[in-house]
Amino acid sequence: MTVYRTGTDSVLMRSLIRAAQNGKEVTVVVELMARFDEEANIGWATRLEEVGAHVVYGVVGYKTHAKMLMIVRREEERHGSVLRRYVHLGTGNYHPRTARLYTDFGLLTCDPDVGLDVNEVFKQLTGLGRAQTLKHLWQAPFALHANIIAAIEEETKAARAGKRARIIAKMNSLLEPETIRKLYEASQAGVRIDLIVRGVCTLRPGIKGLSENIRVRSIIGRFLEHHRIFYFHAGGKENVILSSADWMDRNFFRRIE
């Protein structure tokens, strides 16, 4: 499991401690540089180590901002026992307080290919493996930015060919220069783009000849809009990507996402 923010009173962290005490093999990737949560994370890391959990601190030089949880179980089937991976991937932190106040999405799956990708990422984070080409996950700092750029470019090509093209993206911040430039190019090609950005956005929408096909808005309501979700028409395949990353330099290039 990865831990970025979890607070001082976490049922989930207590459950991990209990699992380790009950003889389960528990590995936790704890980010000690999560701003304002450093003390809480150090405390949980110490308690986990005391009960025999394997605690690691990610990759030197990169913050581990991804939100991933994997449970591996041996299950009996007709042809014998098999190891099955259950995986949770989220846009938000495993934090009891923000889980009540923020809007986030999560995917819970036992799909073997997704489980294999997550397993490879955990091997990399714990020092047991190197970065691999993943089938379903777009991982920063290796492939996420390049894949986002490629997806925008595909919509641009479709629009120039007179085909349907559409981009909808929701995030907390939009700052990364190359991504913004590619969105401008897509707009000029005729791609209709809706951006829902909660915080800082340096893209300028509605400028004739540059961004007249781009609309930017924020949603203000009872809950803090925290999830990141990106939609690309993709020639009718309609790709939808959930992410822990905003479109910022730090997320694309200096964090594990």
Predicted regions and their residues:
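PLD/PLD-like phosphodiesterase catalytic module centered on the HKD motif
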Residues: 5, 11-12, 16, 22-99, ...
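Gly-rich Lys/Arg/Thr-decorated short loops/hinges at beta-loop-alpha junctions or inter-strand turns
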Residues: 128-137, 162-164
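Short, compositionally biased "basic patch" segments
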Residues: 113-132, 147
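Short acidic catalytic loops
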Residues: 1-2
